[in-house]
């Protein structure tokens, strides 16, 4: 049985996300796969590439043929050079910077302060009408007691 390592398309329209899969060469692009060995999300900045290197090396060693796009991805990760016995790639993969949650929270709070109009803040979560009614009731009670 001829086995290929190929990309299985997932995601939405104009937002492709791919799974790197091992499948029979005769199977459809998005058909049944033997094994899923990685992910590729080209629309993210930088592109997300996750590959299970151990499984890739196994499938290449038993004769699985990568398609051209997968071969390019494997060259970027260094798995193709490892299989062929070539030197590792000189250009390292770009890694996304971790998101600073404190900075995001501060920016979010700043936007919230801009959206809330001065003098319209409701403390206690009651609306103006509800506050007026409660004030009238307390005034009536105090008059009735006196």
Curated annotation (Swiss-Prot):
Region named Disordered: 119-146
Keywords of this entry: Ribonucleoprotein, Ribosomal protein
Q: Name one Pfam family in it.
A: Ribosomal_S16
Q: Which HAMAP family match?
A: Ribosomal_bS16
Q: Gene3D superfamilies given for it?
A: 3.30.1320.10
Its signal peptide is none
Any one Gene Ontology biological process term?
A: translation
* Natural source organism: Thermobifida fusca (strain YX)
Q: Which cysteines are cross-linked by disulfides?
A: none
Cross-referenced InterPro entries: Ribosomal_bS16 (IPR000307), Ribosomal_bS16_CS (IPR020592), Ribosomal_bS16_dom_sf (IPR023803)
Q: Does the keyword Ribonucleoprotein apply?
A: yes
**From the record, what ranges are coiled-coil?**
none
What cellular component terms from Gene Ontology apply here?
cytoplasm; small ribosomal subunit
Q: Write out the biased-composition intervals (Basic and acidic residues).
A: 128-146
Picking any one GO molecular function of the record gives: structural constituent of ribosome
**Protein's UniProt name:** Small ribosomal subunit protein bS16
Q: Which gene encodes it?
A: rpsP
Report whether Ribonucleoprotein shows up as a keyword of the record. yes
Report the family membership.
Belongs to the bacterial ribosomal protein bS16 family.
């Amino acid at each position: 049985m001829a086995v290929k390592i190929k990309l299985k398309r997932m995601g939405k329209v104009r937002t492709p996300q791919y799974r790197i899969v091992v499948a029979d060469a005769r199977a459809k692009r998005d058909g049944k796969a033997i094994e899923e060995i990685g992910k590729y999300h080209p629309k993210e900045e930088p592109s997300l590439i996750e590959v299970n290197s151990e499984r890739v090396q196994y499938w290449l060693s038993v004769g699985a043929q990568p398609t051209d796009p997968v071969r390019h991805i494997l060259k970027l990760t260094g798995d193709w050079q490892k299989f062929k016995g070539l030197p590792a790639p000189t250009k390292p993969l770009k890694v996304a910077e971790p998101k600073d949650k404190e900075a995001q929270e501060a920016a979010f709070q700043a936007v919230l302060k801009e959206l809330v109009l001065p003098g319209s803040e409701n403390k206690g979560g009651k609306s103006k009408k509800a506050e007026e009614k409660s004030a009238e009731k307390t005034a009536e009670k105090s008059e009735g007691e006196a």
